[in-house]
Each structure stands twice: as C-alpha cells, then as structure tokens.
UniProtKB/Swiss-Prot annotation:
Gene Ontology terms describing biological process: microtubule-based process
Region (Disordered), start-end ranges: 434-453
Organism domain of life: Eukaryota
Name the UniProt record assigns to this protein: Tubulin alpha chain
EC number: 3.6.5.-
A Pfam short name: Tubulin
Catalytic activity: GTP + H2O = GDP + phosphate + H(+)
InterPro entries: Alpha_tubulin (IPR002452), Tub_FtsZ_C (IPR008280), Tubulin (IPR000217), Tubulin/FtsZ-like_C (IPR037103), Tubulin/FtsZ_2-layer-sand-dom (IPR018316), Tubulin/FtsZ_GTPase_sf (IPR036525), Tubulin_C (IPR023123), Tubulin_CS (IPR017975)
Native source species: Plasmodium yoelii yoelii
Required co-factors: Mg(2+)
First-tier enzyme category under EC: hydrolase
Active site: 254
Amino acid sequence: MREVISIHVGQAGIQVGNACWELFCLEHGIQPDGQMPPDQAGRANDDAFNTFFSETGAGKHVPRCVFVDLEPTVVDEVRTGTYRQLFHPEQLISGKEDAANNFARGHYTIGKEVIDVCLDRIRKLADNCTGLQGFLMFSAVGGGTGSGFGCLMLERLSVDYGKKSKLNFCCWPSPQVSTAVVEPYNSVLSTHSLLEHTDVAIMLDNEAIYDICKKNLDIERPTYTNLNRLIAQVISSLTASLRFDGALNVDVTEFQTNLVPYPRIHFMLSSYAPVVSAEKAYHEQLSVSEITNSAFEPANMMAKCDPRHGKYMACCLMYRGDVVPKDVNAAVATIKTKRTIQFVDWCPTGFKCGINYQPPTVVPGGDLAKVMRAVCMISNSTAIAEVFSRMDQKFDLMYAKRAFVHWYVGEGMEEGEFSEAREDLAALEKDYEEVGIETNDGEGEDEGYEADY
C-alpha cells in the first residue's frame, strides 16, 4: 500500500483537517464512529482508501493523521465534536499554552516540549504502514504554531524520513485581511524553512477563498466552515487518485516530479472548478472544456495572485467524475491556443493530467452543488512571486524599525535569523524572475533584453 500520513498543525491546520476528514468519510461511506456499514463494505474491497485510513481488528477505520496544537481549545473541539470517535485519542495532541502568534515560541520554547510526543506518534503511524509514501502537512504561516511549530516538525521529519515526500498546504496571509500584526515576520521566517524542508507547498489564502464564496456561491458573509469545505474539495481532488481508481492515477511523488522544475521553485497555485451553488448548477451544463477554462480563471485562484502577470511552468489537472481522456485532450489543446495563458518556452508540454472516476462528493447541507465532474488544478507559475514580494515589503517596513523583534529575541531567537530569512526570500524572488526570462523572448520588464530580437 502507498500510505500517506496527514499532519494538522495549529488552528488553521486542524480546522481544515476537520473539513477534510468529514469529506473523506463521506466519500468512502465511513460513519463518524469509524464503522463502515455492511452494504458499503462489499463496495470497499478495492481497499484503495487504506492509503488514508487503517482498519483495526474490530472493523473500525482510523485516519492516518495527527492533530497538534500548542493550546488545547481547538483540539478539544475535535475531542468533543461529531467525529470524536473516529480518531485515536493519542492522535490528538495539545499543549498547555499557546504560541501567541510568535514564530519563536512555536519553534523554540513551547514547541520543543511537544515535538517529541508528536514524532513518537508519527513513528507509530509510520510503523503501521507497509509502504509510506509521504506526508501531507496542513498549517498556516501567519500564526505562531503553524509557522514555528510547523517548521520545527518539517525539519525533524526531514531528519527522520529523509526521502519521503512532504506536501504542504499553507494558509498564507491575505493582502487585505490580516489576523495578526506580526504575520509578515512569521511568514518570512517560516517560508525560509519551507524552502528547504518541503517538496511542494500549495498556497491558500483566505481572502481569495472568501471572494470565491461570495462571487460563486452567493454567500454574503462566508464563515471559516464555508472556506474550509472548499479547501477540503481541493485536497480531496488531489488525493482522490490515491484513494480511488481511475484512468490516469497520480501519485504524491508524481506531483513533485511534474511540477517542480528547480528544487526551490515549489510554491503552487491551486484552483477548483466548478464552484457553483445548487440553484445555479441546475441551469448550467458544465462540460469538461468549461470547467477547464474556469480552472484557469484568475478569479478562481485560491491565492490572491494573478497568473496573467507571470508565466506557467507546469500544471497538474486532476479531473474527477464523468470525464474521458478524449475530452481532456481537447480541453488542454484549447487552453494551449489561448494567448492569455502563457507558458515559459523552455517547458513546451507543461500539462500533467489525472482522471478519476469517482464523482465529487458534497457535504449534506453544504454550499456546493452536486456535480457530475470537477477539476482541480495545481500550477507552478512565476506570478506567485508577487505573493512573496507583498509579504517582504510588509516585513521590511516593520523590520526597519525593529518593531516587535524583542518578542522573538526574548524567546531565544537571534536577530540574525530575521535577516537570513529575508535574504533567502529576496533570493527566491530573484529565482522566479530568472525562471521567467531564461530564454529568447525576454520578459516585459526587461526592455533592453527584448530590443535585440
């Protein structure tokens, strides 16, 4: 079996995790207590869902995951929630005091008290696997636990499980909506670590997902539950080929191979289509080419970043439901002819497609309509650099005055780490710029270069 262990860190990671496991259980017909009703059990002999669930002797299905937070409230919600019987009590780990939005607390002081318990638990999960494929990590980079403790966890996983792939779903701070003043510090410090210790990082940003909920689902005031259920659909589509069978299955390590041209350039944009409310879906015919086009719409990107400002290096399209390869090839051919969607010219093919026959499942009482087919796109675009430069500007404004730095230094961090992380990000921005112009046609901003041709 090719198992995957999910690690949910901090409030954002855990709440996204709740939405994901709720959806996975619905998709596999597993009840909130982990049992699979007898009528489902016959259907389940394909066993593919064992990549995410392990089955106990008593016929109970337990998710292969760990929930960690440095303070108890969010984990307690899982302990008392609908799915409390699904998880093994040891998988829900909480500390006593929180990281207080401080990277240094999560990474150094408070984090190191909890890290060994977590790694021990992960070790038990890993021993229970026959062929561990890798880890999915869920966290936010703006807070203290997700950023500081999340990075500590990734660093330790790199040591213990060097060759296993690590995919990270990071909730990135939004341009306008902020939840903490020190977000820029935490983000820059944690990206410094993400650069080295993850193989693929998928950027999600609340503001972008708010806008999608408002625009496409007509929700006036989206809640975190609305957002997380949408994120869960993306994660479900990505992992569907591990959990069900299909025409073109895509492995976790395949993402890496197809999406990451250079080790550092591994920050991905994601989009999902169709995001439609039940009232609208009733009147629309959502063909393969239509959903493919809307996956490339800038407004449907799950991070505030306009791919028209950059070029695509590679793209992974994961279709699910009633889709045949012929339609996919036609849709991709149409995309390639569009002038608005530009690829770097050193990567002429640029598309990796996966098809899975299991149609998307929706949460009863949720906002999304039940549709026959859906697509999730993960793309590597040079435009993501604008997300970093936005963050770096905010970081510079604060760091020039050394504002709030004493909180970090007081927790045992050195000031040099700030400048080191910031330089690393400056180098990353430069990398993205160079990837875009590495060939003959030059880039818009590089006029002198272009004049020669």
